[in-house]
A protein has these predicted regions:
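N-terminal charge/polar-biased segments
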Residues: 1-10, 16-20, 49, 54, ...
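Phosphate/nucleotide-donor binding subsite
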Residues: 56-100
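Short beta-strand segments
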Residues: 11, 40-42, 64, 105-107, ...
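Glycine-rich phosphate/nucleotide-binding loop
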Residues: 117-130, 134-144, 224-228, 232-342
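Glycine-rich phosphate/diphosphate-binding loop of Rossmann-like nucleotide-binding domains
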Residues: 20-21, 33, 37-39, 44-48, ...
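Short glycine/serine/threonine-rich phosphate/pyrophosphate-binding segments
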Residues: 18-22, 85-98, 102-116, 123, ...
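N-terminal glycine-rich anion-binding loop in soluble enzyme alpha/beta folds
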Residues: 21-72
Length: 343
């Protein structure tokens, strides 16, 4: 008897390269791993047309028709409420009612965040589900959370981010006893804004995490911590700056290398080494960012995602289910209730 599949609903219509790259990524995922089954949700005729180009085990891939598409420019709350037959809403209901374990989308971030809270729903006790992208560092990767749309956070939320992020890094990424740092503007404990000052002692006194103190933004690329905690406004700034600097550097390097004939010869020698270096700063190998703390896994992958990111976002869902991430998060959160009762 086959063990049951990890069932993943995929928004086939979301993102700049939908449906072509989404469908391709889904096929690559099922061909790469027998444990996963994908439900491609979206306009069936269009999806079927794309699927003709590929061979795959039909047992592992189904198409679910959804007539509507939520566009990136639409106000998320309204779109989720009104477009009941959209790929995002339909796929999220599949997670809510247990047909699927996870949902992957490259579509509207706002709609995914709102739908995650409203349709899939939070684990009891979780104050706010953080969007947690993996960012490349010299040592591997770090988890940066929150990078969602929730701009005002409370100290208790940041503590939950630290716990959920630690569970994820340990169980999905295999990092033993992950180091947790809080984003700050100096290493000293008395630095920072009100939120950081209030959160610092709470993290320091939290036995479930390995808190190493403040982390300055410039130490993030060096891999100063495995789990990096901040409010979403700060997280978004760090993430976008990261992406911008990476692509600017890449551009400079390409321009510089091709500028003279003599350097072209040198460029040929440098290129393989450089490619390897830049590849280590490429996040596509991990796929999207999980939205943690929901009753099911929601993965938001970049709007510009190609097949490889989609594939890896889908495969990420396997470890999430097999390592029972949500059970571990529930355990961490219910420890809070017990602690509150004892005080």
């Amino acid at each position: 008897e086959m063990a049951e599949y990890v069932n993943v609903a995929v928004d086939a219509m979301g993102g700049d390269n939908a449906p072509a790259e989404i469908v391709k990524g889904a096929v690559e995922a099922v061909n790469a791993d027998k444990r996963v089954k994908v439900f491609l949700v979206g306009k069936e005729p269009v999806i079927r047309e794309e699927l003709k180009a590929y061979s795959y085990d039909a047992e592992q891939l189904e198409v679910v028709h959804a007539e509507e598409v939520i566009e990136t420019a639409e106000p998320p709350v309204m779109a989720i409420r009104r477009k009941k037959d959209s790929s995002i809403v339909k796929a999220m209901y599949m997670v809510k009612n247990g047909e699927c374990d996870a949902f992957v989308s490259a579509g509207s971030t706002g709609a995914v965040l709102v739908g995650g809270q409203v349709i899939v729903g939070r684990i009891r006790g979780v104050e706010r589900p953080p969007l947690a992208p993996l960012i490349p560092t010299e040592k591997g990767v770090s988890l940066l959370l929150d990078c969602g749309a929730n701009v005002d956070a409370r100290p208790s939320m940041l503590v939950q981010f630290a716990k959920m992020g630690s569970v994820y890094m340990e169980s999905v990424m295999g990092v033993k006893n992950p180091r947790v740092g809080i984003v700050n503007i100096g290493a000293e404990e008395e630095k920072g804004n009100a939120l950081v000052k209030e959160t610092f002692p709470l993290l320091k006194n939290c036995p479930e995490i390995n808190f190493i103190g403040s982390v300055e933004a410039r130490d993030i690329p060096a891999g100063a911590a495995d789990v990096i905690v901040c409010e979403a406004f700060v997280g978004n700034v760090i993430l976008k700056m990261y992406e911008g600097v990476s692509s600017a550097l890449l551009h400079q390097v390409k321009q510089g290398m091709m500028s003279t004939l003599r350097s072209k010869m040198g460029a040929l020698l440098v290129k393989p080494a450089l490619k390897t270096t830049l590849k280590s700063f490429d996040t596509s190998q991990y796929g999207g960012a999980p939205l943690l703390g929901l009753n099911g896994l929601v993965v938001k992958t970049h709007g510009s995602s190609k097949a490889v990111e989609v594939k890896n976002s889908i495969l990420q869902c396997i470890a999430f289910k097999e390592e029972k991430i949500n059970e571990k998060i529930k355990e961490q959160i219910s420890l809070e209730d017990k602690a509150a009762e004892n005080n």
